[in-house]
């Protein structure tokens, strides 16, 4: 969804698409790069595709931030978390209808490999843990803007 969201932003210039790509992209794509769920390593094409695809999300969001001067506001954290919750809830029936091996947003089972989900409860309860982490990460992603805003308002 982050890929589609940043592409839609570039076509429409609607800030809502940027915001979703910003929070979901930096958290999801960032985690995907740090802990890839591919079973192969470099130079296998699946590994390269995975890394390039997720890097393009981050590059697209960074481009919008630098060139278009976009940034999130505090209220946007809540709006994007609400949208991500709706998407997460819709992913289970979509994965179910698609059948195995569909596991978009990892709602059916945990991703393979060593990653943070190893410390979470078994499926489907791991989604509660993932949701809590997503909330925390979205607020952490916003902290630099919060600090910047506080510093600017405290200057005479």
Where does each model-flagged region fall?
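Cytoplasmic-side transmembrane-helix entry/capping segments in multi-pass membrane proteins
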Residues: 18-26, 50
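Alpha-helical transmembrane segments in multipass membrane proteins, preferentially the mid-helix core
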Residues: 6, 57-73
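Membrane-interface helix caps and helix-loop-helix hairpins in membrane proteins
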Residues: 11-16, 36-48
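Membrane-interface transmembrane-helix boundary segments in multi-pass integral membrane proteins
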Residues: 79-82, 86, 98-138
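Membrane-interface capping segments at transmembrane-helix boundaries
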Residues: 70-72, 142-156
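Membrane-interface loop-to-helix entry segments
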Residues: 45-59
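Aromatic-anchored segments of alpha-helical transmembrane domains
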Residues: 25-36, 84-93
